Amino acid sequence: KSTLIRHLNRLIEPTSGEILVEGTNVMSLNKQELIEFRRRKMSMVFQRFGLFPHKTVIQNVAYGLEMRDISQDERNKISMEKIEAVGLNGFENQYPNQLSGGMQQRVGLARALATDSDIMLMDEAFSALDPLIRSDMQKQLLSLQSELKKTIVFITHDLDESLRLGNHIAILNAGKLVQVGTPVDIVMNPADDYVAA
């Protein structure tokens, strides 16, 4: 699953096939076009947060904007909006090691939101969190999604989580796609014993 999501933005180079995003074949992009594509079209939230330990919360959130040469005033304005959106107002000057795991994951989410990319890739983003924080993050993601209407590719090994968060689910088993459908389709018409289990 993690390998698949890294193929979507070519963090891992696929050996064959096409990756189509809004009619653009990501496989055909040269290095500079790929950099621009990643900056503008996709953002990623990692399982292990992926935060810079030497940067404050606001600096971490602003990082993608800095890479786009957005002015510091505008970066800070956008970053504070996203920090507030994920419930971390008042923590903008803290460093990652001063935050709980759930708070660090919120910083990662705020950073992904700050770039306003069309597609968010979330790789096991909540799996390292304890169950209560995980449930809270799921609620927050659903709330943000209803407001922002972003495409989110959410990788999880937890079927319950996928059923709660997804409106279109793809199930992989041993690297093979075994079923694609809505949560109701998956539950009511499992493709095989693996999906039914």
Model-derived segments and spans:
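Conserved ABC ATPase "signature" region
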Residues: 24-25, 62, 66-69, 73-91, ...
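A short, proline-enriched helix->beta-strand linker immediately N-terminal to the Walker B motif
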Residues: 114-118
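Helix-to-loop junction immediately C-terminal to a conserved catalytic motif
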Residues: 9
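Conserved ABC ATPase signature
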Residues: 95-99, 103
